[in-house]
C-alpha cells in the first residue's frame, strides 16, 4: 500500500493492500477501495462509497458527496463504482437519495472526462464515455457503450439506451432509443449511431435490419403505434431491433426523443 504522508485516511476506511493514495487526498470512514485503485493528488472520496478494482481517479475529483437534493436529510445512501473506470479531474459523482433508489451505480470500464457529473440515483452501464462537462441529472439511466459529448446534459429521469450517441452541447430532455444518435437543444433524433455500430463490430446484417426498422418506425404513414407493431412483427427474430421496441414499450417517466419532423 502506498499512502502519501499528506493524505488523510479515516481509520475505518477499507483499503486493499495495493491501493495508492496520492498527496492531499481524503478518504472517509465509510469508503471501500478495491485492489489496484489509484487516487492521484487532491482526491476526495466520502460518504458510503465503494470504488471497484483498478479504477484511477485524477486530481480534484469528488466521489460520494451528498446528493444535491433539497429533500436529503443526511440519510446513509451509497455510491458504487465498478472496476477499471478512469475518472478525470474535477469529476463529481454523488450518492443516492433515501426517497429514490438510495444508490448511484456506475458500471465498469468507463471514461469520465474532466468536469463531468453523475447525480444522485443514476444508473450508468459499462464502457460509457462522458466527455468534458457532460452532466447527468438525478435518476438518469444510461446503457452500455453510450458516448455523451462535451457539455451535453440529460434531464432527470431520462433513459439513454445502449450504444447511443449524444452530440456535444445536446440537451436531452426525453428518452433516447438504443443505437440512436441525437443532437441539439432540445435534442432530437438524427438517426442511428452507425459509426459506433461499425466500430463495435456489429455485423452488416444487424445494421441493415436496424436501418430498415428505423425507416419504418419513423415513416409518415399510419400512427406511431401501428408502425411500432409492424416493426415488432417483421423483425421479431432480431434481438437488437426488439431491444428498441421493448425500450419504447416500457413505461417511463419521460417522453421519447423523436426526429424533428415527429416532434
From Swiss-Prot:
It is found in: Cytoplasm. Gene3D superfamilies: Hexapeptide repeat proteins, Udp N-acetylglucosamine O-acyltransferase, C-terminal domain. Keywords: Acyltransferase, Cytoplasm, Lipid A biosynthesis, Lipid biosynthesis, Lipid metabolism, Repeat, Transferase. GO terms for biological process: lipid A biosynthetic process. It catalyses: a (3R)-hydroxyacyl-[ACP] + UDP-N-acetyl-alpha-D-glucosamine = a UDP-3-O-[(3R)-3-hydroxyacyl]-N-acetyl-alpha-D-glucosamine + holo-[ACP]. It is an enzyme of class 2 (transferase). GO terms for cellular component: cytoplasm; membrane. Its main location: cytoplasm. GO terms for molecular function: acyl-[acyl-carrier-protein]-UDP-N-acetylglucosamine O-acyltransferase activity. Pathway: Glycolipid biosynthesis; lipid IV(A) biosynthesis; lipid IV(A) from (3R)-3-hydroxytetradecanoyl-[acyl-carrier-protein] and UDP-N-acetyl-alpha-D-glucosamine: step 1/6. It comes from the Bacteria. CDD domains: LbH_UDP-GlcNAc_AT (cd03351). The keyword Protease does not apply. Belongs to the transferase hexapeptide repeat family. LpxA subfamily. Homotrimer. This is Acyl-[acyl-carrier-protein]--UDP-N-acetylglucosamine O-acyltransferase. The lineage of its organism: Bacteria, Pseudomonadati, Pseudomonadota, Alphaproteobacteria, Caulobacterales. The gene is lpxA.
Amino acid at each position: 500500500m502506498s499512502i502519501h504522508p499528506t493524505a488523510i485516511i479515516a481509520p475505518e476506511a477499507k483499503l486493499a493492500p495495493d491501493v495508492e493514495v496520492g498527496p492531499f487526498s481524503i478518504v472517509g470512514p465509510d469508503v471501500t477501495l478495491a485492489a489496484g485503485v489509484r487516487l492521484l493528488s487532491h482526491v476526495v472520496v466520502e460518504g458510503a462509497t465503494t470504488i471497484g478494482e483498478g479504477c484511477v481517479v485524477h486530481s480534484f475529483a469528488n466521489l460520494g458527496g451528498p446528493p444535491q437534493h433539497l429533500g436529503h436529510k443526511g440519510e446513509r445512501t451509497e455510491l458504487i463504482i465498478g472496476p477499471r473506470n478512469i475518472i478525470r479531474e474535477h469529476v463529481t459523482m454523488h450518492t443516492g437519495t433515501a426517497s429514490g433508489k438510495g444508490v448511484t451505480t456506475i458500471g465498469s470500464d468507463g471514461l469520465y472526462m474532466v468536469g463531468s457529473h453523475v447525480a444522485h440515483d443514476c444508473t450508468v452501464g459499462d464502457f460509457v464515455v462522458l466527455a468534458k462537462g457532460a452532466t447527468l441529472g438525478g435518476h438518469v439511466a444510461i446503457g452500455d457503450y453510450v458516448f455523451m459529448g462535451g457539455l451535453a446534459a440529460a434531464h432527470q429521469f431520462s433513459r439513454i439506451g445502449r450504444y447511443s450517441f449524444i452530440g456535444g452541447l445536446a440537451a436531452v430532455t426525453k428518452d433516447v432509443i438504443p443505437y440512436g444518435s441525437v443532437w441539439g437543444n432540445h435534442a432530437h433524433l438524427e438517426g442511428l449511431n452507425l459509426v459506433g455500430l461499425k466500430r463495435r463490430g456489429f455485423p452488416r446484417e444487424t445494421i441493415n435490419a436496424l436501418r430498415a426498422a428505423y425507416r419504418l418506425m419513423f415513416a409518415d404513414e399510419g400512427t406511431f403505434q401501428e408502425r411500432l407493431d409492424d416493426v415488432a412483427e417483421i423483425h421479431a427474430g432480431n434481438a437488437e431491433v426488439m431491444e428498441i421496441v421493448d425500450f419504447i414499450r416500457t413505461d417511463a417517466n419521460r417522453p421519447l426523443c423523436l426526429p424533428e419532423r415527429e416532434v
